[in-house]
Amino acid sequence: MTKIKSKYQVGKLIYGVVEAHTPFGVFVDIGEAEVKGLIQITDFLDTGSMTPEMYPEIGSSVGSVVVGYTEDERNQVWLSVKPSVLQKSLVKLKLPASTQI
């Protein structure tokens, strides 16, 4: 099992800071120099269309759920902030759905 896979298990709730916008999503600093979080544009909303203009501001904090990762030289943890994915993670933690992240 790789370091990324063992530390950032799918379904884990993590926090980070938005550090860059791209046409395909945002990169998130998750507190580890050699690993970057990535929220792809398709992992923001359950329904409707997300556009880069709607991204959270650079420097803002985000709570997200690990949905995958790369095991190559990119060292990326794929994240989601979709309400349905966050809800499932909060239920696993037995936190009320109204908990702000």
Kindly label every feature range from the protein language model.
Residues 1-101:
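Single-stranded RNA-binding regions, centering on S1/OB-family and related RNA-binding modules
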